[in-house]
Amino acid sequence: MKTLLLTLVVVTIVCLDLGYTMTCCNQQSSQPKTTTPCAESSCYKKTWKDHRGTIIERGCGCPNVKPGIDLMCCRTDECNN
């Protein structure tokens, strides 16, 4: 009986994926792709232009931005690439 109960608990944890964390890209501009696990449920990609050209910043969450900065937020793994 204990074995059956333990099996049900393990199956429930695997099916619910309780340990799931979001994965977001976090490379800057044209750097090689890198990712990071995130506690937040979204990823972002900020884009703006300055004297260096187009700058791209990626990361976890969905931050507030100043006017003139384009922001794209999304909710799937590596969606901000």
UniProtKB/Swiss-Prot annotation:
Keyword Secreted: yes
Family indicated by similarity: Belongs to the three-finger toxin family. Short-chain subfamily. Type I alpha-neurotoxin sub-subfamily.
Stretch forming the signal peptide: 1-21
Cysteine disulfide links: 24-43, 38-60, 62-73, 74-79
Presence of the UniProt keyword Signal in the record: yes
One Pfam family it belongs to: Toxin_cobra-type
GO MF annotation list: acetylcholine receptor inhibitor activity; ion channel regulator activity; toxin activity
UniProt protein name: Short neurotoxin 2
Locations listed in the record: Secreted
Major subcellular location class: secreted
GO cellular component, one term: extracellular region
Role played: Binds to muscle nicotinic acetylcholine receptor (nAChR) and inhibit acetylcholine from binding to the receptor, thereby impairing neuromuscular transmission.
Keywords, comma-separated and alphabetical: Acetylcholine receptor inhibiting toxin, Disulfide bond, Ion channel impairing toxin, Neurotoxin, Postsynaptic neurotoxin, Secreted, Signal, Toxin
Tissue expression remark: Expressed by the venom gland.
